[in-house]
């Protein structure tokens, strides 16, 4: 018990990075940018039918945080899962992969 170690300023950040869990990354198309600092992204998920084996396309719409309002409708974007930013926002815009024409 006499041996106590004090954490330096650099150690908590390193420990925090190890504690933080896996965060999902998704690609999708922006379908709405009418809100301030928020975009709606349609994400496609491909699943195999359990009985017949056919690959099905399932889409879901998620709200993502766009701090600088740079994404527009039709852009292909990369989003990452993040802490809850509002009642419905759990994703953050990482980068715009392809601008709409």
Swiss-Prot record:
Keyword vocabulary terms for this entry: Ribonucleoprotein, Ribosomal protein, RNA-binding, rRNA-binding
A GO BP annotation: translation
Domain of life: Bacteria
A GO CC term assigned to this protein in UniProt: cytosolic small ribosomal subunit
GO molecular function terms noted in the UniProt entry: rRNA binding; structural constituent of ribosome
Keyword presence, Cell cycle: no
Transcription regulation is among the record's keywords: no
HAMAP family documented for this protein: Ribosomal_uS17_B
Record family assignment: Belongs to the universal ribosomal protein uS17 family.
Binding partners and assembly: Part of the 30S ribosomal subunit.
Reported function: One of the primary rRNA binding proteins, it binds specifically to the 5'-end of 16S ribosomal RNA.
Name of the molecule in the record: Small ribosomal subunit protein uS17
Organism: Leifsonia xyli subsp. xyli (strain CTCB07)
Gene name tied to this protein: rpsQ
């Amino acid at each position: 018990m006499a041996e106590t170690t004090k954490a330096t300023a650099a150690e908590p950040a390193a420990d925090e990075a190890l504690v933080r869990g896996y965060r999902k990354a998704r690609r999708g198309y922006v379908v709405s940018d009418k809100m301030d600092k928020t975009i709606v992204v349609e994400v496609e998920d491909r699943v195999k039918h359990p009985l017949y084996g056919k690959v099905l396309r399932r889409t879901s719409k998620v709200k993502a945080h766009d701090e600088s309002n740079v994404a527009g409708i039709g852009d292909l974007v990369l989003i990452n899962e993040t802490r809850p930013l509002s009642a419905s926002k759990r994703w953050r815009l990482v980068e715009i992969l392809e601008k709409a024409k």
